[in-house]
Amino acid sequence: MAVIAFIGLGQMGSPMASNLLKQGHQLSVFDVNPDAVQRLVDKGAQPASSPAQATIGAEFVITMLPNGDLVRSVLFGEQGVCETLSREALVIDMSTIHPLQTDNLIADMQSKGFSMMDVPIGRTSDNAITGTLLLLAGGTAEQVERATPVLMAMGNELVNTGGPGMGIRVKLINNYMSIALNALSAEAAVLCEALGLSFDVALKVMSGTAAGKGHFTTTWPNKVMKGDLSPAFMIDLAHKDLGIALDVANQLHVPMPLGAASREVYNLARAAGRGREDWSAILEQVRISAGLTANVKK
């Protein structure tokens, strides 16, 4: 079993640390909230008065903190991790922070001769409690292999995301999709209600279409990602249908800001001459708008 310093015992960190204890790992814990520390001490952890004290003798140092500035302070600040960190130890940041902060932290740790990887998590606090988190491992092959037994005490699925800093990048994209879709789904649900439509009926229909399953796993793999823009559903028709939905919403005084923004993306594609292409060609149009090279020639 490993000797671990765990720093950051919030809503996610506390149950994650608890699961490490359940698997027999030796934990030293630190948090600015003494009550959070005491709850882990009651379960068998050793309390620490600072990140530096927690790190003494640790093989792994896990940080689970609210933002990148705090991670930097914990690592490099007064009584920080680096004051007592062994050159053989591995630092694992599991916080959700800005990817560029992650890159800088890893580079700064490497410049001091230390090893660090990022492993942000997916799923919810309930999964943190049950030890069924999704672990997005960003590190070298050696780091991922070494950390896996410790990480799997906190989760049941580990994805090697392809190198240092890649974990937080895929977490960022996943959260962006989830959060934006949550708002778009709310617009659709309220429009259902305003139209007098049973939400259960709408849910049954959408669960079998791209609306419920998502384009990453339905339309895109079969069309644009194969280099095929022949229309299964034309952008012109998608634009028309979206316009009808927005017109109905306007008449019912239902705000649809995300839907309106989406229509402008389809307008852009039509202006670029893509109206008769498959609606998955939106991906290509957004790539071009971002200054990237199109993958599929028109």
From Swiss-Prot:
InterPro entries documented for this protein: 3-OH-isobutyrate_DH-rel_CS (IPR002204), 6-PGluconate_DH-like_C_sf (IPR008927), 6PGD_dom2 (IPR013328), 6PGDH_NADP-bd (IPR006115), HIBADH-like_NADP-bd (IPR029154), HIBADH-related (IPR015815), NAD(P)-bd_dom_sf (IPR036291), SLA_reductase (IPR030876)
Gene: yihU
Annotated positions binding 2,3-dihydroxypropane-1-sulfonate: R123, N174, N175, Y176, M177, S178
Keywords: NAD, Oxidoreductase
Binding site for NAD(+): Q11, M12, D31, L65, T96, K240
Reactions catalysed: (2S)-3-sulfopropanediol + NAD(+) = (2S)-3-sulfolactaldehyde + NADH + H(+)
EC annotation from Swiss-Prot or TrEMBL: 1.1.1.373
Protein name: 3-sulfolactaldehyde reductase
Annotated SUPFAM superfamilies: 6-phosphogluconate dehydrogenase C-terminal domain-like, NAD(P)-binding Rossmann-fold domains
Family label: Belongs to the HIBADH-related family. 3-sulfolactaldehyde reductase subfamily.
Entry-linked PROSITE patterns: 3_HYDROXYISOBUT_DH (PS00895)
Pfam families in the record: NAD_binding_11, NAD_binding_2
